[in-house]
Regions:
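Glycoside hydrolase catalytic-domain context in secreted enzymes
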Residues: 1, 5-253, 260-270, 274, ...
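Short beta-strand elements
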Residues: 276-294
Length: 544
């Protein structure tokens, strides 16, 4: 068992643990290693001992989840999980290794402030983290780097993304691609060819056409997945997987500043994991499509554009161009921790906010306290651009607006002017807890366990459980699911997030939200980006 906390996360065995493994393997011929940690771990040592016959990854299972472990060992339960992250042999070879934590600016030490962290005083200074790897997070880097001949995959990756063993064997047969109304469908016949009942996962990936030096694209991209029913030996099930063509578009931050579906051949494959292709078909895009302006993707409310340009910084980002030729430069530790102009001046200006500098005699006080006869309930399902929103906002009083912000922790304040009642919001992703009364629910498996099932229906059931418990405890809001990406193996909150992959995480999270919603509970998909640990919370706060 890996001992750790938000302040202490390790990626390899301690000497004490090495000694324990030596002792066990010296005394037993058949050894099973159980890894009880939420983050990826260097498990290469298991290859060095012939006595170690298998490895079971069993992260936080909640109050009673560990009861199933014995059933797995006895064969009563056939495991069917898949890894939601990539396990590599050596963390120091990861592209994020030199840029995994915050670095304090050397010329902004005077802007440090005192605060609290986990109940202890702490000084917070302005800091930064360079996300130098760009889109090449997790398997998207390792699979692409292998295709480019940049890494020796077998010496780098121990367990690929989407990998997991079973007590039985499965065969998957891929049907023809069918396109209709901008969607691609493919039937996959899954057959249990072994001797034990079990479930399998259909993983569908795409490999887009890539132009050297062009839009950054990974060679392997999960686009959809499905879990089979429990199949008896010899039984088959046909799983139909459907996805939108536009979902294969790549974001062009340099030229189009929009999503672009470039013309060319897109290889659609069914995989055993991110690295093992079982079968593949080709889908051809005849003409390039730019999703900009009014021609937005159907899945977008507004067309995606570049934002936070000022945060890009003067650094080199990892590129696939010329077989990752800039890898050493891009992934090096920052050469300087000094913030340049005009950002230093802006930081000091914003930190010494003076509201009087924004006063303008021509400004008009917004309407407040109007009697327009609207209630918040009237706006249910209203469009964002519905003109009634302005009339509703005109009804609010200044005191109500101030109170709404000041009383926004684990609750929302009442607003009588629009008929809004006060609500309670409880934390968190693995249990429902009332921070004020101490009342809480049982612990559920952590999100990384939910993601490892690759089972959308189970994720929805999990959300339903959280919704029902919240309802019974009198809560209307759920501070979950956590939706950040497993960017590094040292993420202090990785246990609260699903995966290194957005498609897997997004599907699991969406189903959980839908499940909670059945009980009238709304969800806060918290920590959406940038929050890898408590030391980074004040960096991420403005954009969360």
């Amino acid at each position: 068992s890996l001992v750790g906390s938000e302040m202490c996360i390790r990626d390899r065995l301690s000497q004490t643990e090495k000694d324990m493994v030596d002792m066990v393997c010296d005394n037993f011929d058949d050894v099973i290693v159980i890894y009880n940690g939420a983050n990826q771990f260097e498990l290469g040592f298991t290859d060095e001992y012939p006595q170690i016959k298998s490895v079971v990854w069993c992260p936080g299972t909640g109050n009673v989840g560990f009861n199933a472990l014995g059933k797995v060992f006895s064969g009563e339960v056939n495991p069917s999980g898949k890894t939601p992250d990539t396990f590599i042999y050596d963390m120091t070879t990861a592209p994020w290794w030199n840029n995994g934590e915050k670095i304090e600016y050397t010329n902004l030490a005077d802007m440090a402030v005192e605060g609290m962290n986990a109940g202890s005083p702490q000084v917070y200074a302005p800091a930064f983290t360079n996300y130098v790897e760009g889109i090449y997070v997790g398997y998207k880097y390792y699979e692409t780097a292998a295709q480019e001949g940049f890494i020796d995959y077998d010496k780098t990756v121990q367990y690929p993304f989407g990998y997991g063993l079973s007590y039985t064997e499965f065969e998957q047969k891929m049907g023809e691609l069918e396109e209709k109304d901008g969607q691609i469908s493919v039937d996959v016949e899954v057959t249990n060819t072994g001797d034990v009942a079990g479930k399998d996962v259909v993983e569908v990936y795409y490999n887009p056409p890539y132009t050297n030096g062009g839009i950054e694209k990974a060679s392997a991209n999960l686009i959809e997945f499905a879990k089979t029913d429990l199949l008896q030996p010899g039984d088959s099930q046909t799983v139909t997987v459907t996805f939108d063509v536009e979902d294969m578009a790549s974001y062009d931050e340099n030229d189009a500043e929009a999503y672009v579906l470039e013309k060319g051949d897109y290889v659609i494959s069914i995989n055993r994991d991110s690295h093992t292709v079982l079968d593949q078909k080709t889908y051809t895009v005849d003409d390039t499509v730019v999703y900009a302006g009014e021609n937005k993707r159907a899945s977008d409310d507004t067309a995606a554009v570049n934002v936070f340009e000022d945060a890009k910084g003067d650094i080199t980002y990892l590129s696939r161009a010329d077989h990752f030729a800039n890898y050493e430069e891009a992934t090096a530790a920052p050469a300087s921790a000094e913030l340049g102009e005009p950002y230093v001046s802006e930081y000091h200006l914003n930190s010494n906010f003076d509201k009087t500098t924004y006063l303008n005699d021509e400004d008009v006080m917004p309407t407040t306290g109007a009697d327009n006869g609207l209630t918040l309930a009237d706006m249910r399902d209203a469009d964002y651009d519905d003109p009634r929103w302005e009339k509703l906002l005109d009804q609010l009083t200044v005191d109500e607006m101030a109170n709404m912000i000041a009383m926004a922790g684990y609750q929302t304040a009442a607003m009588d002017s629009v008929g809004k009642v006060a609500t309670l919001d409880f934390d968190g992703p693995a249990a429902i807890n009332n921070n004020f009364t101490g009342v809480g629910s049982i612990g559920f498996p952590i999100e990384v366990v939910i993601a490892s099932t690759w089972n959308k229906e189970l994720a929805q059931t999990w959300g339903e459980c959280m919704g029902k418990i919240s309802q019974e405890m009198g809560a209307e809001g759920w501070y979950a699911p956590g939706m950040n990406t497993h960017r590094t193996a040292f993420g202090a909150r990785n246990y609260e997030y699903f995966s290194e992959d957005g498609v897997l995480a997004g599907n699991m999270g969406a189903n959980a939200v839908e499940g909670a919603r059945k009980y009238g509970v709304y969800s806060y998909i918290k920590h959406f980006a940038l929050y890898e640990g408590l030391s980074l919370i004040h960096i991420s706060e403005p954009t969360r």
